Amino acid sequence: MSGETRAQSPKNARATQRLEPRLFRLEDDGFVPNHPRWPLLVYPAAVSLSEAPDPAAVFEDVFQRNGWGGTWRNGIYSYTHYHSQIHEALGVARGSAKVQFGGERGPIVEVTAGDAAVLPAGTGHKRIEASADFLVVGAYPPEGRYDLCTRPEDRERALTTIAKTPRPATDPVFGGEGPLIGAWT
């Protein structure tokens, strides 16, 4: 099946649709640095969840099989924040939301179950609104260190650490040959 990758969930095979992601190049807005070189990637309908009894487990499995770990299940904070020392993958397991990326002047993107986003270090994000059942699975590459930046004084240090955060070896959804590899050069 050309153009499609199969990902195994803990109980059943689930298709990971090989679609080109939407790329967002986000600029430093004076509070949120964003990444100076690499775009935010948003994969619409990246993972098929239609028959999954535990859709979050499907994302956990896809991320882990592609070398991204430290998974968690939750929502997205309702305030602008970013991580300056690590990249982050977000998979929408249930529901839908409007998420603002890049800071207060950044785009508001609607995400729904099955969508995934990959945020390079420094990418601001916050939940604008969400359905009551909204559930996200987050994951991180093995390189980097988790931090949470929310204050103006975090920015100066972040400008240095963001640039030093290495490119991950794999795309969290599609592995070693995923779109992230070409987009983050």
Segments the model singles out, each with a brief description of its role:
Residues M1-H81, I181-T185:
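A short, N-terminal "cap"/entry segment at the start of jelly-roll beta-barrel domains
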Residues W68-G69, G75, R94-S96, E104-G106, I128-T185:
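Double-stranded beta-helix
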Residues H83-Q100, V118:
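Short, conserved beta-strand element in jelly-roll/cupin
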Residues V111-S131, Y140:
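Conserved metal-binding segment of the jelly-roll/cupin
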